[in-house]
Design a protein with these regions (language model features):
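Alpha-helical transmembrane segments
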Residues: 107-117, 161-169, 237-253, 433-443
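Membrane-embedded alpha-helical segments and adjacent helix-loop junctions characteristic
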Residues: 49, 66, 79-80, 84-186, ...
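C-terminal structured "cap/appendage" subdomains that terminate the fold
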Residues: 427, 435-468
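Membrane-core helix-loop-helix motifs of multi-pass transport proteins
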Residues: 182-266, 454-488
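Transmembrane alpha-helix interface/packing and boundary motifs in multi-pass membrane proteins
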Residues: 68-77, 153-163, 200-211, 397-409, ...
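Transmembrane helix-bundle signature of multi-pass membrane transporters/permeases
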Residues: 117, 155, 173-177, 196-207, ...
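Hydrophobic transmembrane alpha-helices of multi-pass small-molecule transporters
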Residues: 1-111, 236-375, 475-481, 485-499
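Helix-coil boundary and interhelical linker segments in multi-pass alpha-helical membrane proteins
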Residues: 228-233, 421-433, 498
């Protein structure tokens, strides 16, 4: 059965992105996707260039929006859309050819390649299967409890592994094995859809609750200290952010049960006794499992200590990406490793898809198109005329959905947090409260596969479609924004943050 799990990853269908979910709405989207994308491209490209937006930014905006339309509609394979985006970026002179092509060499591409290798190694060695069976028999007596256990693990890892992508690389192999045990078929099982999408969302929501969960959080803290004069500590962030994060995740879980109802699925009748028999049948740890465990623990330690290595070793440190490459190399090394290159089943169509997505997004940023859009949103809504309570809500919702325009948490933090601090000072509001609340939303990059590295890693399993993620992600973002807004007016006040 471990071989089947590997195949479930390698056979993930990236041809269109929306055929996985099925349904009339997706069929209509596929039919109108190409003409709609052409219309969007032509409209944005040929309209008079707005004041403050360069023509290069206008071209980047047209290409990005047209590509986004095709990715969501799934009218053509998503990797083909990425290739068209790269072609359009270069032929229109929006970016230089070298810049468009170099995205295939980004560190995230290496991380994704390494994630495929690590996943295949954990599966083939049976270590992932052993852990999954142990987890189910110990804590996951029902499918719902299994999902809750996975959410808990994601939140726990956020404290120890300061990288969203690293945590996804750890969790995906476990999820694949669990779904194999439950006989969930990629593209057909609602349980599979929900498990993978909850993985995406738990990763992001947990990150918002821990200051060290991502670099963007720490950048926000730095801006608040430098521009608002307040030093936000680890526990300050945790106490302010974690309650809304936990409530958001719980509500999202129950919404997911409604959106992806799996009660009619078969495969859950396999009794706990049989699962315990399977676990017992694995016997003692085998040599491949011991090798996999050593590689896994080494990888986890390097990921968890990334932020401290330079201080410990006089400026020397190993990044999350290099750690993944080292681990993948060990898995492939003759005599030491666990799998061959062919067994890794690396999906290069996914790499092309990701490269094109980053090329389009980076072009929007480098041409100042993204900054122009954010500027219009921040200063074009007439916030200075609104009541302070309304400003908080608008800013929180704006921050939450800003990843729909461009995806980098770091870039959005760098652009938006100083702008919100300045806005608060102008309006006589508390800049710390406004900036902190906005910062909690910036990790919610959960609505489309290109919006984060985590999304692409989970999307590679083939269990959910672009449209599945879009509808669930939008609901989760709305819930998160509402709860953070309520937290500002209640919980923040108890913690001493004034409006």
């Amino acid at each position: 059965m471990s071989g089947e799990a590997v195949k479930s990853i390698s056979s993930a269908d990236f041809s269109g992105g929306t055929e996985i979910g099925g349904g009339k709405s997706e069929s209509v989207l596929k039919k109108i996707g190409i003409p709609l994308a052409i219309a969007v491209f032509a409209l944005l490209l040929l309209m008079p260039t707005p004041t403050g937006l360069s023509y290069s930014g206008q071209k980047a905006l047209a290409i990005f929006c047209a590509a986004l339309t095709l990715w969501v509609a799934g009218s053509i394979p998503i990797y083909l859309t990425s290739m068209l985006a790269i072609i359009a970026l270069t032929l229109t002179g929006t970016v230089k050819e070298r810049v468009a092509f170099e995205t295939l060499g980004f560190d995230v591409i290496w991380l994704m390649v390494s994630a495929f290798v690590l996943t295949a190694a954990m599966v083939k060695s049976n270590l992932a299967r052993r852990f999954a069976l142990w987890m189910i028999t110990s804590f996951g007596g029902t499918p719902k409890r299994t999902l809750l256990v996975l959410i808990f693990i994601n939140f726990a890892l956020a404290f120890f592994v300061p990288s969203t992508t690293a945590r996804a690389s750890l969790m995906v192999p476990i999820c694949v094995i669990l779904l194999e045990i439950y006989r969930a078929v990629p593209g057909q099982s609602n349980f599979g859809r929900l498990m993978m999408l909850l993985g995406v969302q738990a990763d992001a929501v947990a990150t918002s609750g821990v200051m060290t969960g991502t670099a963007a959080n720490m950048i926000a803290v730095k801006f608040i200290k430098e521009q608002a004069g307040t030093d936000i500590g680890y526990m300050d962030w945790l106490l302010a952010a974690m309650p809304s994060a936990i409530l958001t995740m719980l509500l999202t879980f129950f919404v997911g049960l409604k959106l992806f109802d799996f009660r009619g699925e078969s495969g859950f009748s396999e009794g706990m006794a049989k699962l315990k028999e399977q676990l017992a049948g694995l016997g003692k740890l085998s040599a491949p499992e011991k090798k996999a465990m050593v590689i896994f623990v080494l990888t986890l330690l390097l990921w968890a200590t990334e932020d401290y290595q330079e201080a410990w070793f006089n400026g020397f440190g190993i990044s999350v990406y290099m750690t993944a490459v080292i681990a993948a190399t060990l898995c492939l090394m003759p005599g030491i490793g666990l799998i061959t290159w062919k067994e890794a089943n690396i999906k290069w169509d996914l790499m092309i898809f990701a490269a094109g997505a980053y090329a389009a997004g980076n072009a929007l940023e480098s041409t100042k198109g993204a900054q122009w859009i954010i500027g219009k949103l921040v200063y074009g809504l007439g916030l200075e005329t609104m009541a302070p309570a309304t400003v908080y809500v608008v800013v929180i919702f704006m921050s939450m959905f800003s990843h729909m325009i461009f995806t980098s948490k770091t870039v959005r933090t760098t652009i938006m947090i100083p702008a919100f601090i300045a806005l608060a000072k102008t309006l006589g509001m508390n800049p710390v409260t406004l900036a902190l609340a906005a910062s909690f939303t910036l990790t919610y990059t959960i609505t489309l596969p290109p919006h984060s590295k985590v999304n692409t890693i989970y999307f590679a399993t083939g269990y959910f479609s672009v449209l599945d993620q879009l509808k669930y992600g939008l609901v989760t973002c709305f819930i998160g924004a509402v709860l953070i807004s309520l937290s500002v007016f209640t919980w923040f006040r108890l913690l001493g943050y004034g409006l």
